[in-house]
């Protein structure tokens, strides 16, 4: 039978990066109070202190304060086992939290599940359909089981959903003959049989080949362009970087940072100047006298933190002091380096 799908609406942009505590540390004030679910109408998803402890004392999700902006594509990024799926299951009412509060589309949970979920579409832990039925027939059965769906418009809505995910030509094909990418797109179509304001996807590109990954990534962008807020979990850094506007970073159950991707980039280490020269000692002395910070010499290269000085000004200064400059550039930390610094471990970076 098909993966249960749940329905919902969206939230205000988080304009700055919020960096939380490292895993295992006490919960601390990060400079702003956690968002209040009662005042969460500007966000698609808001959590405050959301925690899940399993029997035996294992803490799967630890005091997560999450704020997903309305209209964003929010990447929920973290290594496997960091608590992403457990968080999603709590958001959708599939697992009860141990403590904390949350809201969907401005509606406090869990009391408002019946009101909020019809506006939320979700695909959690992979799609499941009848293999011997066609894609269209599977959607018909799903739609008929939805008490909120209008049977009079079923044919038109199913056709529109198939067209939206690019499966119109394969509508009559048996599900067992679908590629992995087609199966994932059919699951998204099932979640969008009626208009949704929030779409929650758990690892939607997991196990897909590069072509299937591109298909799903393109589809998510199109859905977001239509005004739906998309909350997508992933352990693939490249996926989050290519399709998301905002990101939350999980590590061993804790949310260690969240905000716009551009702001996260800016929150990394300061850019470093790199000078390739046969006169490394002289170049280092010039940079130090000019007030640049953290001057280092290694393997015929000199690096330093420029601060407010313009790179072209520094290059001209070196040349004016008689330093032979063979190469000059500015190195900024990659998104991968920033996230590894936040989590203390790496991410899969392949497509």
Language model segments and positions:
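Short, flexible helix/strand-to-coil boundary loops that buttress conserved ligand/catalytic motifs
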Residues: 143, 265-268, 342
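Compositionally biased, low-complexity flexible segments
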Residues: 22-26, 30-34
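ABC transporter nucleotide-binding domains
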Residues: 42-47, 52-251
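Primarily ABC-family ATPase nucleotide-binding module
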Residues: 34-43
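ABC transporter nucleotide-binding domain
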Residues: 217-305
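C-terminal coupling/interaction segments
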Residues: 2-20, 24, 306-351
